[in-house]
């Protein structure tokens, strides 16, 4: 086995997906605690104390207690290199999340055990399922009264179409929470106990002899009944199914009280796959331990360090090894680029990196070379990774600078924030109007906040409301086709499109110009 293969096998790169407020950021912090990266895990809601979640680093995230960008965190655990991508839970930022899911080898799905599967979780699950990567489930908030565990397992199959296999099982919940029956490790994990007293072994018959009082407790007896039922009618653990994404191991716990998280992390590290091969150049398979370096840009973030007004391109290494100063080719332009400055992350904290391998995420200082979706490669053979998903905006606003004397900072801020991909920029076809398009309202609020905070440029947003965006072949375009009901604009690449007032206006246009081809995006 080569040194490269050995290093690649140590990598575990995954994203955490959930509905907002299911506890995704809290479980991330607890994992970082076990990785020795942080000394204490604060709760995200404690905003007044000035103590914020490690992964919520942007000013607006700290202010509102929500994640609106994907954070990257890296640490060592049990001889493995863990790369966590903490994605935005808010639906308006799902495009950032979708792209992030293209850069991971597994996903952790966090579910609020009181609420079960919620809409955003369902949406994100579909993307992960499509990729065919393993999904690990953490049923969170066991310290509160929630739904019956059997119902939660059944819901996975009913709503998501995936088999759930229980790795542990609650002994009570809420104020009556006693612990977890650890099926996988044949032990009981007691709630709110020190490390030395936390685990009680079960004998070969599954009997608990070290705590007679608990063994006789009606809650424990109820747990044993559930486990008997699972053995009779539940799904059987199947590692091959897990790796294909057809079965999800289910763990119960409470991220807030750090209960069940360590057991989950231990199992995850052992079960989750190392970096897998990628399909490149449309139909070729590229092994992760192929010696030639290659990767793709899945995210661009401006102002991670507000003092330097910089831009970082996040690259998932798909194959080979990165070395500081490596010369690569940017596939889109064919131009050579030397990668001298690369960083690894602990949210907004950075460490200069001299080498990294397939599975790792590195940040490249970007002076404008990179775009989201770019492929880079070091060998002579061109390598192009598949396109990343792109959403068609649904809400549009005209944007102007409040202070006309600050045009320079207005343009710089707008161009940098647009390059991050959460919001899209259009220009009037025959005017100088700037029009922004987004999937949801929160993106405009974040844009406005960041323009003021990071670029000292206050903006005015004038709503155009919900519009249907449709691109048109330039050869078929006649500017006279434009009207107040179908506004003609051009995208960042200069391609023309109409912003229709509603679906009726689009149908009317198609009836009037039956030969004109409209597409939802280029």
UniProtKB/Swiss-Prot annotation:
Specify the superkingdom.
Bacteria
Q: Which GO terms describe its molecular function?
A: GTP binding; GTPase activity; translation release factor activity, codon nonspecific; translation release factor activity, codon specific
Has UniProt tagged this entry with the keyword Protein biosynthesis? yes
Q: Cellular component per GO? A: cytosol
Q: Where is the tr-type G domain?
A: 9-276
Mainly localized where?
cytoplasm
Q: Where in the cell is it found?
A: Cytoplasm
Family per record: Belongs to the TRAFAC class translation factor GTPase superfamily. Classic translation factor GTPase family. PrfC subfamily.
UniProt-listed NCBIfam families: prfC, PRK00741.1, small_GTP
- What is this protein's record name? Peptide chain release factor 3
The gene behind this protein is: prfC
């Amino acid at each position: 086995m080569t040194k490269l293969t050995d290093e690649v096998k140590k990598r575990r790169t995954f994203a955490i997906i959930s509905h907002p407020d299911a506890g995704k950021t809290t479980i991330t912090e607890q994992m970082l605690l076990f990785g020795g990266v942080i000394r204490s895990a604060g709760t995200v809601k404690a905003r007044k104390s000035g103590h914020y979640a490690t992964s919520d680093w942007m000013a607006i995230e700290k202010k509102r207690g929500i994640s609106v960008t994907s954070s990257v965190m890296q640490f060592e655990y049990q001889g493995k290199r863990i790369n966590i991508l903490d994605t935005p839970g808010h639906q308006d930022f799902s495009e950032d999340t979708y792209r992030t899911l293209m850069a991971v080898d597994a996903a952790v799905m966090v579910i609020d055990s009181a609420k079960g599967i919620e809409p955003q979780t369902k949406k994100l699950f579909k993307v992960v399922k499509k990729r065919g990567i393993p999904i690990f489930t953490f049923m969170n908030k066991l310290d509160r009264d929630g739904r019956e565990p059997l119902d939660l397992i059944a819901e996975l199959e009913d709503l998501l179409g995936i088999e759930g296999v229980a790795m542990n099982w609650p002994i009570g919940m809420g104020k009556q929470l006693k612990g977890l029956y650890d099926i996988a490790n044949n032990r009981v994990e007691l709630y709110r106990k020190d490390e030395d007293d936390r685990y009680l072994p079960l004998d070969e018959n599954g009997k608990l002899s070290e705590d007679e009082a608990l063994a006789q407790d009606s809650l424990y007896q109820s747990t044993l009944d559930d486990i008997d039922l699972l053995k009779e009618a539940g799904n059987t653990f199947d590692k091959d199914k897990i790796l294909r994404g057809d079965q999800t191991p289910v763990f119960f716990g409470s991220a807030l009280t750090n209960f069940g998280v360590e057991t989950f992390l231990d199992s995850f590290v052992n079960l989750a796959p190392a970096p897998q091969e990628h399909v490149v150049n449309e139909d070729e398979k590229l092994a992760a331990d192929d010696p030639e370096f290659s990767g793709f840009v899945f995210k661009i973030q401006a102002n991670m360090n507000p003092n330097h007004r910089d831009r970082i391109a996040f690259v998932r290494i798909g194959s080979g090894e990165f070395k500081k100063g490596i010369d690569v080719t940017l596939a889109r332009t064919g131009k050579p680029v030397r990668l001298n400055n690369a960083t690894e992350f602990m949210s907004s904290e950075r460490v200069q990196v001299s080498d990294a391998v397939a599975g790792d995420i590195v940040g490249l200082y970007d002076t404008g070379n990179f775009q989201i979706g770019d492929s880079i490669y070091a060998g002579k053979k061109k390598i192009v990774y598949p396109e990343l998903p792109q959403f068609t905006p649904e809400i549009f606003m005209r944007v102007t600078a409040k202070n006309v004397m600050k045009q320079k900072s207005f343009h710089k801020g707008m161009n940098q924030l647009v390059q991050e991909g959460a919001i899209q920029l259009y220009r009037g076809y025959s005017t100088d109007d700037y029009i922004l398009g987004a999937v949801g309202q929160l993106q405009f609020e974040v844009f406005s906040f960041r323009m003021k905070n990071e670029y000292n440029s206050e903006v005015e947003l004038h709503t155009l409301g919900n519009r249907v965006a449709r691109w048109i072949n330039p050869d078929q375009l006649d500017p006279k086709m434009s009207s107040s009901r179908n506004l003609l604009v051009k995208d960042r690449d200069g391609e023309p499109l109409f912003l229709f007032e509603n679906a009726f206006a689009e149908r009317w246009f198609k009836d009037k110009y039956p030969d004109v081809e409209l597409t939802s995006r280029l």
